[in-house]
A protein has these predicted regions:
Chain B
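Sequence context of c-type cytochrome heme-c attachment sites
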Residues: 34-37, 42, 50, 54-82, ...
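Sequence/structural segment immediately N-terminal to covalent heme-attachment motifs in c-type
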Residues: 30-64, 159-160, 169-199, 204-212, ...
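Extended non-catalytic domains of envelope/secretory-pathway proteins
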Residues: 193, 199-202, 206-319, 324-337
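Boundary at the C-terminal end of the N-terminal hydrophobic targeting segment
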Residues: 23-27
Length: 586, 411
């Protein structure tokens, strides 16, 4: 029998980036906020100090940084004809757990989506005609202009380093000329580039492309954010993605918000408690709070006026399904919306090997790189190409972590002494150019509940049905050719191309950019949440995270996730609290 | 009778009963209570009189002295366990003479040799402020002192030798700011309690005033700011910034000084912090004797440990990242003739005090599990002899002794 706890104004399910942002915003409004996190308290000096942060074996290979999938995981299959099996070990993506969420182990590549990305359906239909059969791309219901101040806010919170390419409509030399307008320059200058980025800049210039520094949440200099939190200059150690930063040099909830938030008397954090379900009243149209369980198995009813789901794209979608809010999507009938439009990211790359030049990839950082954006979104004419969307192409030097990094030229055996020699010969003399491709929604890529497998509490696991689509393959093929052109001009001895080949394989690491499932949109017939991320069905439930993306753009998602969270927080503060109820009339 | 009327009748009765108390409350005007609140901040009362995780001012916190553990009492106005039955005269006597209401002597862990410099009105204001706090019932644990230290009578002798009661007398030769600073440093601020070396009986060595001391396995650095002093290279502005925000270009506060900043100096008026700076900058010292430089093998070993473990934050040339990671070059703690704090920080790590100005509790990790006594000694010796620093080398035995002293005692 669940014990009933005293009510709070707001309960946050999950305490990563979006949970911390919402907690900070709503406690500022004077609300009593409780965050419930299934994982542990984590902080820099106690959990990832410099003395243990760069432990590749522990954090990445033994997966200590991520969600424990012996308690809960996903099942996976490529298509509806297959039987999904549980992912017993993370591979293609790495779901976080604990305070700070996946935002502890991100690289820090902090992009804004293009203005046209938010109107991907109407924009592309206008320009190229109807979408192909099976493609379920749609507009976000919110525009770039509306989100601009919120992108700006997040960039200042994090101390993003970069160079503006479009300052209030004026194109700036050295920045990304394709980006949406910015109301201000980045708060910090770009990172220091290395030999590889210089080669990339030279090669792209030769092709008439405009290279610019990747926007980075690794600090290019000491920074104090608007809350007074201090971040230290990055040391370029190359332990960002898959690791916590020991040097206070990477923006995360821990380094940018928690020092201030944790001191507030109207904020409470409860760790090691998992929310089992959002509880609804008899009408099913109002949430009464959540039911959660601690590690000893004791269950609690936590009443709250407002429930905000901040449990990562996959966790949030599953919680909506388990709570019975909205109808679960069924691809056979096209009915239902929860779980629809699951998208990912379509990556491909080329490696460049030098004969006598040292790239020294161990001097790295998660967002140390140069990029070009000519082939992203609708920055180029897609007429006759057979796909929509695109991706940025970049040369990042994120790391040369010794267990993970072993680039070898074409034709090298995959093991044995010849392999070892090739690794040793090329370790300091290679780099890579990658395409970060968008992922367009299709009717057959979706999430639902698995009919067979359950988690440690007996709840059905979520089932992922996903494969690369015809649009993905055509787009990635095009981008990979552009990658090849650039790589070939970077002055190396040889290159090796790694095109994206289907079917999608859930094991090799690609990116932790899972999107869709509780998509946002203009009305309740096409979306789970409205433009303020408010549930159409239960208006005192809001859902944060990339699960609200109707499809994924050719960028890393964190910037857009945070901007949408700030946009939602503002709507709650200025509209919802005055008059609790639907913020958009259906 | 309707319910609201009934309630107001009851309220009227309550007011009548409470009338004598109301009269007292009127005397304690807002201004008086605020004066007391500020005076409490200047004396950092909260720091010692609050046990971790317990209600503020309810006492119970142990102060480790060379003679044993002395517990701070409850100073809320709870009648049984706190000051609830004390008169203003009782409180004055405690602060001015170091004696309890029954005439018994306090241990000078309670810094009455400093508080005696506070004028009566200031002490009364503290009393009035403490009277406004929520009373908390909390017994003080027994002090853990061996014979004869547990005989309070012995304190009469101590007082006779080291204690002279008397309110601060301004020096007419000096500026108003200097006098205010001297009052704050020597009176309520009781800086010498940590920053002055003690004699064998625990009294301050007058000749060593504010030249650094040792307490509870920490060495507190020399804070004299005049020529030859430990912070001679700090400007007045830098002293003010440090006391206000917990950081300045040279260093960041942690450990005991973190508490002082958290509960005391960050709450003080900038004029007062400037007065402290004016006073400290006027304290000259004799030049320090240059220390011996470690041998080359130690410097080589120390440099290797430093580059692998320390340089990412403290930077290859010891310049650190001001206000984020402490510079080691020119650091008062690093150059302290007493290396206790340097060794201890390497072993245990340190946490910069989060303040209103700088809320991030930036921390250095512990290296005790990673570095041997020899490695700690080598790297400590290296930083104490590099980049303009010139303090004596550290031996592995010193490291081992401190490591042993810091082991948690098994109860």
């Amino acid at each position: 029998m669940a014990r009933k706890l005293p009510p709070v104004d707001v309960v946050l399910v999950g305490f990563g980036w979006t949970g911390a942002i919402l907690a900070q915003e709503l406690t500022d409004e004077g609300l009593e906020v409780l965050a419930i996190e299934r994982g542990a308290w984590r902080d820099t000096p106690t959990d990832f100090p410099t003395t243990t942060a760069p432990d590749e074996l522990r954090w990445y290979w033994r997966k200590e940084m991520f969600q424990n999938n012996s308690r809960e995981t996903l099942t996976f299959r490529n298509n509806r004809g297959q039987t999904a099996l549980p992912m017993r070990r993370w591979g293609s993506f790495l779901v976080g757990e604990g305070v700070g969420g996946s935002g502890v182990h991100w690289n820090g590549q902090t992009w804004r989506f293009l203005p046209s990305d938010f109107v991907a359906a109407s924009h592309n239909i206008d320009r190229y005609g109807p979408l192909p059969e099976g493609m379920t791309v749609q507009d976000y219901g919110v525009t770039y202009d509306e989100l601009e101040p919120h992108f700006d806010r997040f960039e200042k919170l994090c101390g993003i380093g970069g160079k503006a390419g479009n300052l209030n409509g004026r194109i700036e030399a050295g920045g990304n000329p394709f980006e949406g307008w910015r109301s201000a320059e980045y708060p910090n200058p770009p990172m220091h580039m290395t030999f590889s980025q210089n080669q990339f800049a030279r090669a792209t210039a030769e092709l008439g492309l405009k290279a610019f520094p990747g926007p980075s949440a690794n600090m290019s200099r000491a920074y104090t954010n608007p809350l007074g939190c201090q971040l230290a200059p990055c040391t370029y150690c190359g332990f960002c993605e898959k690791f916590g930063c020991g040097n206070y040099s990477k923006a995360s909830a821990q380094t940018t918000i928690l020092p201030v938030l944790m001191k507030k008397p109207n904020f409470t954090l409860k760790t090691h408690n998992e929310v089992l379900t959002i509880t609804l009243d008899k009408s099913g149209q109002r949430a009464t709070g959540v039911r959660h369980v601690d590690l000893e198995g004791n269950e609690y009813e936590q009443p709250a006026d407002l429930v905000i789901v901040c449990a990562y794209a996959l966790g949030s979608t599953r919680l909506m399904m388990l709570s019975g809010i909205g109808e679960i999507y069924n691809p056979a009938t096209g009915e239902g919306l929860v779980g629809k439009n699951y998208c990912y990211q379509v990556m491909s790359s080329a490696e460049v090997f030098y004969e006598d030049k040292y790239t020294n990839g161990f001097v790295g950082a998660g967002a140390l790189g140069m990029a070009v954006d000519e082939y992203n979104g609708d920055n180029f004419d897609h007429t006759g190409l057979g796909f929509i969307g695109g991706g940025y192409i970049a040369n990042w030097t994120t790391n040369a972590r010794p267990i993970e990094t072993h680039r070898t030229p074409e034709g090298t055996p995959t093991w044995g002494s010849a392999w070892k020699k090739a690794v040793a010969d090329n370790f300091l003399k290679s780099t890579s150019v990658g395409a970060h491709g968008a992922s367009m929604a299709y009717a057959n890529n979706y999430l639902d509940l698995d009919p067979t497998y359950t988690d440690v509490y007996g709840r059905p696991l979520m089932r992922m049905t996903y494969d690369f689509t015809p649009n993905d393959m055509a787009m990635s093929g095009f981008l990979t050719e552009r990658v090849r052109e650039i790589a070939e001009l970077m002055g190396g001895r040889e290159i090796k191309l790694n095109p994206r080949e289907g079917p999608y394989d859930s094991m090799p690491y690609q990116t932790t950019h899972n999107t869709g499932g509780t998509i946002m949109g203009t009305n309740p017939t096409n979306s789970v949440v409205n433009r303020y991320l408010q549930s159409w069905d239960v208006p005192n439930v809001f859902v944060m995270g990339a699960c609200v993306f109707p499809q994924n753009a050719g960028y890393n998602p964190t910037g857009a996730v945070a901007a949408l969270a700030y946009h939602a927080a503002e709507a709650i503060r200025t509209q919802y609290l005055r008059s609790p109820g639907p913020l958009v009339q259906a | 009778m309707s319910a609201p009327l009934h309630a107001s009748a009851a309220l009227a009765a309550l007011v009548l009963v409470a009338a004598p108390l109301t009269a007292t409350a009127q005397v304690n005007s807002f201004a008086q209570v605020e004066r007391g609140r500020y005076a409490v901040a200047t004396g950092n009362c909260e720091g010692c009189h609050t046990a971790p995780g317990e209600p503020s001012y309810a006492g119970g916190r142990g102060l480790e002295t060379p003679f044993g553990t002395i517990y701070a009492p409850n100073i809320t106005f709870e009648p049984e366990t706190g000051l609830g039955r004390w008169s203003k005269d009782d409180f004055w006597r405690a602060m001015h003479e170091g004696k309890g209401p029954d005439g018994s002597n306090y241990y000078p862990a309670f810094p009455y040799p400093h508080f005696t410099k506070m004028p009566r009105e200031e002490v009364d204001a503290i009393y009035d402020y403490l009277a406004t706090l929520e009373p908390v019932r909390k017994e003080k644990p027994e002090n853990e002192l061996p014979f004869p230290m547990n005989q309070r009578l012995s304190l009469s002798v101590w007082n006779w030798m080291f204690f002279e009661p008397g309110v601060y007398q301004p020096d007419p030769e000096k500026s108003a700011a200097w006098n205010r600073g001297a009052y704050l440093v020597e009176g309520p601020g009781h800086c010498a309690a940590c920053h002055t070396e003690k004699n064998i009986a625990g009294g301050d060595k007058a000749s060593e005033h504010l030249k650094g001391g040792q307490l509870d396995n920490w060495s507190a650095p020399d804070i004299r700011g005049g020529e030859g002093g430990g912070i001679a290279h700090w400007s007045e502005d830098q002293i003010v910034e440090y006391l206000k925000t917990g950081r300045n270009e040279h260093t960041a506060a942690f450990s005991s000084m973190a508490e002082v900043i958290e509960y005391s100096t960050q709450l003080m008026l900038e004029d007062d912090l400037r007065a402290i700076a004016v006073y400290l900058k006027d304290l000259d010292s004799d030049a320090r004797q240059p220390a011996d430089r470690p041998g080359e093998p130690v410097m080589t070993a120390g440099a290797a440990v430093y580059f692998d473990n320390c340089s990412a934050c403290h930077v290859a040339d010891g310049s650190g990242v001001p206000r984020i990671f402490a510079p080691l070059s020119g650091s008062g703690k690093v150059n302290d003739p007493d290396a206790t704090t340097v060794i201890r920080v390497i072993l245990e790590g340190a946490r910069a005090v989060p303040t209103k100005a700088h809320p991030s509790p930036l921390s250095m990790p512990a290296f005790d599990w990673k570095l041997s006594d020899e490695q700690v000694a080598a790297v400590a010796s290296y930083v104490r002899a590099s980049w303009g620093n010139a303090a004596a080398p550290v031996t592995a035995d010193e490291v081992a002794a401190l490591r042993e002293a810091l082991q948690p005692t098994v109860q």
